[in-house]
């Protein structure tokens, strides 16, 4: 295997809750209140939608076919293999990742190559002042059963999404007895208002069981799937092991070819006046109210 090249899950497409638009001659992020599933191809209008976007949108329970939940499957049992997250500082001009840390230690490009330094988190790091460093998370998920190892990637710099996804993955992993990859899950878009958002709703991504499935039934189903897979010779532990090795094959997981896209979407100076989570006007509140009420009813 080539050293210095991070081996990450094969990506078939992207899941986002926003898009890049042109305003005043500049390309800036525009937030949204729904999911969009795209391919990895761009044209003059932006990312080309993946066929799965239209298929899932047609099944959406709301009248305007806004996609606010997506059925998904995790590829790995280890939560940290499905969700990757670090504090990340990019060069705004080249898109090159300069520093990546976990709050304790970091890998940083220096005069002598990649150097190891303490990571005090962005609030306390002199290199990160001015919002240059943010948490950057990538969730790898499977949407298409015809390609068991193909993934769609959800990228975010939002604390709410990263924190919620990390918690859910660990809880489901523990509750199912290390059968995370066998659970029937779905991505769910949620909204809340805070003082920081000036009481307008901000949107973040949650991970839940599929609608109509309780935890006991999900675990029972996961055990059956696990037994069938083992009987067929499938070795999940080996898959997790190889994935862990692949991630660790390089100092930085993010390649230079995708760095500029990440900077444009998440580290854009024009977006400082916006919330780094998905925020919208109060006019959108009524539009998502039914979805939020359904979530509450499901919990009750």
Enumerate the predicted regions with their spans.
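Generic surface-pattern signal
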Residues: 170, 174-178, 210-212, 223-227, ...
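Primarily single-stranded nucleic-acid-binding OB-fold modules
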Residues: 178, 184, 260, 264-267, ...
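Short amphipathic beta-strand/extended segments with alternating polar/hydrophobic composition
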Residues: 84-93, 151-157, 219-220
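Generic structural signal of hydrophobic/aromatic residues within well-ordered alpha-helices
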Residues: 165-168, 172, 218-222, 238, ...
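Extended serine/threonine-enriched, polar tracts that run as long, contiguous segments within proteins
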Residues: 128-216
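OB-fold ssDNA-binding interfaces and closely related basic DNA-contact patches used
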Residues: 1-146, 198-200, 272, 276, ...
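Generic alpha-helix signal with a bias toward terminal, lower-confidence helices
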Residues: 86-88, 164-166, 197-199, 219-221, ...
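Eukaryotic intrinsically disordered, low-complexity regulatory regions
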Residues: 217-283
């Amino acid at each position: 295997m080539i050293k210095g090249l991070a081996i990450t899950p094969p990506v078939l497409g992207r899941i986002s809750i926003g898009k890049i638009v042109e305003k005043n001659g500049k390309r800036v992020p525009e937030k949204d209140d729904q999911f969009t599933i795209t391919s990895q191809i761009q044209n003059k209008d932006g990312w080309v939608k993946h066929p799965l976007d239209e298929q899932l949108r047609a099944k959406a329970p709301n009248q305007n076919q806004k996609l606010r939940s997506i059925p998904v499957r995790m590829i790995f049992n280890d939560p940290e293999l499905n969700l990757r997250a670090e504090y990340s500082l990019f060069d705004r001009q080249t898109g090159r990742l300069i520093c990546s840390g976990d709050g304790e230690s970091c890998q940083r490009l220096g005069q002598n190559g990649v150097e190891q330094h303490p990571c005090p988190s962005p609030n306390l790091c002199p290199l990160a002042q001015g919002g240059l460093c943010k948490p950057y998370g990538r969730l790898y998920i499977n949407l298409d059963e015809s390609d068991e190892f193909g993934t769609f990637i959800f990228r975010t710099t939002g604390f709410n999404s990263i924190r919620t996804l990390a918690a859910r993955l660990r809880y489901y992993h523990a509750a199912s007895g290390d059968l995370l990859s066998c659970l029937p899950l779905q991505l769910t878009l949620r909204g809340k208002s805070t003082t920081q958002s000036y009481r307008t709703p901000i949107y973040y991504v949650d991970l839940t069981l599929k609608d109509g499935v309780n935890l006991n039934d999900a675990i029972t189903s996961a055990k059956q799937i696990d037994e069938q897979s083992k009987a067929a010779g499938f070795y999940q532990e080996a898959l997790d092991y190889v994935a862990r090795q692949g991630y660790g094959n390089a100092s930085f997981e993010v390649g230079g070819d995708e760095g500029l896209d990440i900077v444009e979407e998440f580290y854009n100076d024009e977006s400082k006046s916006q919330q780094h989570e998905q925020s919208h006007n109060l006019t959108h509140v009524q539009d998502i109210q039914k979805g939020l009420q359904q979530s509450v009813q499901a919990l009750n």
